[in-house]
């Protein structure tokens, strides 16, 4: 009933108009799983490799026909007749077949899409929702929690065509009593932010992740604008709503000068100076989480940043750790950061993703489930967040259906879980419980 009968891949389009890989996994019992791989814009140098065709005559070189061919050929052949419920075996087969350190032979986009499609088919064969199947794979059967959303309402950096250097300015509806209420609060602030921007004759065009992308005089001006929107929505800043930022500092780090260059403000900083720049912002605004506050290779700088800020706020490693247990283990040993961002496609399989979440949780680090800037309607990360009780999720703003699909799936899951739907809000954030 749960043996794989057919694997079928195709090229589809993501939210940035680029091709990505979608896979159907068909089981003997008639069960089907459908999944698509996301794609990032600001990527860590140690991420698993996304396989692109490189043919400039087609999709500007970004086609994924090679990855599709790998799935429909070698991968499909290897998986036929295998049990879809044995996720670890399926993923290991693909990793071994690929044979490279960074999945560059088949592409992480190919392997991940198969991995997720098989997981969905496996869940269907067990007659259970995906989040329940994931909880079992994670070794925590029957344990679920709803994540606190980190909503990216002002986009900058690589996610927008504006002059803001910091990539994401987020709100967290920590005063909510349920996930559905958190979504409502976020939506209301989002709409009030549009009014605030319009009143200042600023753009309300949106970036890759559905947040507004105005030109502002400084990064602090983004926080000030958000503060105004929160207050106009009738919420108390710091009590009902808190702030979070993703600096994506590797994107404005000059490796030749070892300086962080905020070109939008005309300022440059050393590692220590940039840490204190961020510290100053946390003293002015209720920022309780900062992601990639320094360059991914600046481990000495991160050590200092963790010493300065790590007891007060959540310091999240994204490009720093790239969902990789080997790198995370080193970070834990060296006391660098206190949280990891979890992105399926940075590592390239569900099994390896679950291993990174487990390692973080066992070390007392938080694990934040995240989308990528290039997304599809696939909402698997919603089930991942609930099934691993990760406690936090980043899936963009309150616009663009590729973002909203994840919020809507979480609303459905919360409804299905009923009284079992725990929502811990602020307690899920490192340093805030």
Curated annotation (Swiss-Prot):
Cellular component terms (Gene Ontology): cell surface; extracellular region; phosphopyruvate hydratase complex
Keyword field: Cytoplasm, Glycolysis, Lyase, Magnesium, Metal-binding, Secreted
EC id: 4.2.1.11
UniProt xrefs under InterPro entries: Enolase, Enolase-like_C_sf, Enolase-like_N, Enolase_C, Enolase_CS, Enolase_N
First-tier enzyme category under EC: lyase
Positions annotated as active site in the UniProt record: 209, 343
GO molecular function ontology, one term from the record: magnesium ion binding
Source taxon at top rank: Bacteria
GO biological process: glycolytic process
Pathway: Carbohydrate degradation; glycolysis; pyruvate from D-glyceraldehyde 3-phosphate: step 4/5
Membrane-traversing stretches: none
Cofactor requirement: Mg(2+)
Catalysed transformations (reactions): (2R)-2-phosphoglycerate = phosphoenolpyruvate + H2O
Residues bound to (2R)-2-phosphoglycerate: 167, 343, 372-373, 394
Localization of this protein: Cytoplasm; Secreted; Cell surface
Binding-site residues, Mg(2+): 246, 291, 318
Subunit structure: Component of the RNA degradosome, a multiprotein complex involved in RNA processing and mRNA degradation.
Function according to Swiss-Prot or TrEMBL: Catalyzes the reversible conversion of 2-phosphoglycerate (2-PG) into phosphoenolpyruvate (PEP). It is essential for the degradation of carbohydrates via glycolysis.
Stated family: Belongs to the enolase family.
Name assigned to this protein: Enolase
Organism the protein comes from: Hamiltonella defensa subsp. Acyrthosiphon pisum (strain 5AT)
């Amino acid at each position: 009933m749960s043996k794989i009968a057919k694997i079928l891949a195709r090229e589809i389009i993501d939210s940035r108009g680029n091709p990505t890989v979608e896979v159907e996994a068909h089981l003997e019992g008639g069960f089907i799983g459908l999944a698509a791989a996301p794609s990032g814009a600001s990527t860590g140098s140690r991420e698993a490799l996304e396989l692109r065709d490189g043919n400039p005559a087609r999709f500007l070189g970004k086609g994924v026909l090679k990855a599709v061919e790998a799935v429909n050929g070698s991968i499909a052949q290897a998986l036929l007749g295998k049990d879809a419920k044995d996720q670890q075996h399926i993923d290991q087969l693909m990793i071994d077949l690929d044979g490279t350190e960074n999945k560059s032979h088949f592409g992480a986009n190919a392997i991940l899409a198969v991995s997720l499609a098989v997981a969905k088919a496996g869940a269907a064969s067990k007659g259970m929702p995906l989040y329940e199947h994931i909880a079992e794979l994670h070794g925590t059967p029957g344990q679920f929690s709803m994540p606190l959303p980190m909503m990216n309402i002002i986009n900058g950096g690589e996610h927008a065509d504006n002059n803001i250097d910091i990539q994401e300015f987020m709100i967290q509806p920590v005063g909510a009593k349920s996930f559905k209420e958190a979504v409502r609060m976020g939506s209301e602030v989002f709409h009030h932010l549009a009014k605030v921007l319009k009143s200042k004759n600023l753009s309300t065009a949106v970036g890759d992740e559905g947040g507004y992308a105005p030109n502002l005089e400084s990064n602090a001006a983004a926080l000030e604008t958000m503060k105004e929107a929160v207050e106009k929505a009738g919420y108390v800043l710091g009590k009902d709503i808190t702030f979070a930022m993703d600096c994506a500092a590797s994107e404005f780090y000059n490796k030749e000068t070892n300086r962080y260059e905020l070109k939008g403000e005309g300022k440059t900083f050393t590692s220590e100076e940039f840490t204190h720049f961020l510290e100053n912002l946390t003293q002015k605004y209720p920022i309780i989480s900062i992601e990639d506050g320094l360059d991914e290779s600046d481990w000495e700088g991160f050590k200092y940043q963790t010493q300065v800020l790590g007891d007060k706020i959540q310091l999240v490693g994204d490009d720093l750790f790239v969902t990789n247990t080997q790198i995370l283990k080193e970070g834990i040993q060296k006391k660098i950061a206190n949280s990891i961002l979890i992105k399926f496609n940075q590592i390239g399989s569900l099994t390896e993703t679950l291993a990174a979440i487990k390692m973080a949780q066992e070390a007392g680090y938080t694990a934040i489930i995240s989308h990528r800037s290039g997304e599809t309607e696939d909402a698997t990360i919603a089930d991942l967040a609930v099934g691993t009780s990760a406690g936090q999720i980043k899936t963009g703003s309150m616009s663009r259906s590729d973002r909203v699909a994840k919020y809507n799936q979480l609303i459905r899951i919360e409804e299905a879980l009923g009284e079992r739907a725990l929502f811990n809000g602020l307690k899920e954030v490192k340093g805030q419980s």
